[in-house]
Amino acid sequence: MVGVQSTRADATSEAINELKQQIQELDQKVKVLERQQELDTEAADAKAKDTPRITIGNNGLSAASADTNFVFQLHGVLQIDNRTFFNDRDSHNQSIVGNDTFLLRRARPIFSGTVYKDFDFMFVPDFGGSSVQIFDAYLNYRYAPWLQLRAGKFKVPVGLEQLQSDQYTSFNERGLPTALMPNRDIGFQLWGDVGNGRLSYAAGVFNGVGDARNTSNADFEDHREFAGRIFAQPFKGTSLMALQNLGFGLAGSWGNISSNATGLASSYLTDGQQSFFTYTNSSVVANGRHWRLSPQGYYYWGPFGLLGEYVISDQEVRKGAVKADLQNTAWQVAAGWVLTGEDASYTGVTPKHPFAPRDNHWGALQLVARYADLDIDNKAFPIFANPATSASEAKAWAVGLNWYLNKNIRANVSYSHTSFEGKMNPANATVTRQPEEVVFTRLQLAF
């Protein structure tokens, strides 16, 4: 009996020991699995830190490193236009230049990004014209929002509507004051935004370009042009909702130019992109000081928008032994109302309900109107310009309707009427012989 009990005790003890050993082995396996899981998690976290982030949406294509120190973005603007001229024959039944046409107004891929956190870049070619052009190509160092340095080819900080992105302008073509503004130039610019955007400034030195001109890649002048702009939005971010989008400023440029290579505009253009003023020939050249001054401002509140600017362009010119100081001026006022109630802004309209007819959504509609005037200095005639082919003043008014199907696609139609004043009756078959009447349409993709 005692032997049987002893045998049973030994068997129980052995079973307990085996169970303990199994528990220990199981515990060891659990620890190994837990450690493996920790290692897998650490590896996944490390991989996530090094994995680029790629996003595609209505703001284009973007790829960024996990720490966002390196960013590449692809955007684009495509504008397909039509111009239809009316009453484009004079009283002698002679054609007055204007051609009804479809055109690819802009076809611009926009490459931009950031390297090493503080260095931004932008490169913008345009395939919309008869030849490929480089419109923007610059590098920007961003020490802070209020202190940045830009170098390369970019817009000169003078014209308010000129500085507005092409995809956001109210009409197919910018107003008459743009004819007296510099366009793009090569140079250096110190700029920034102070107080969360309540004050912005820009001051730069450039090769120097004539009115409405882009720079070439080479400069034939020893002189430089200085340009600057200060723009305030004093109520931005405050509780005064009605004044948050009030902005006003002053811009200008000063330079000294002594050749026609960069000094004088080849011509001033109407809304329909027809020349209404030209200097007589290549013997008229820029010959000295050239300065511009432009007070400007805008106001947006709810669906209402208003933009206005005035510009003086003063240029010393010469034809042979004859010299003069010509001062041309221009101004414009443009207003808009979003009929569907969305907010208007300097950067366009975003529909509350993008176009989706199955859901009875139709996007946003905006009614726009503009009046503009450009006055040529009387001293330009008849020595520097021919009064038989060039007008001394152009007055233009326009109305239009913009349809924002969604944030990326927009269609618009507008009508423009430009009348001319001159020192004598225009010659037959010239643009200035009677008012220009033109209807524009556009289909735009911007992302």
Regions of interest found by a model, annotated:
Residues 61-63, 76-78, 104, 109-113, ...:
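Residues on the lipid-exposed face of transmembrane beta-strands in outer-membrane beta-barrel proteins
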Residues 141, 242-244, 252, 259-447:
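Outer-membrane beta-barrel pore domains
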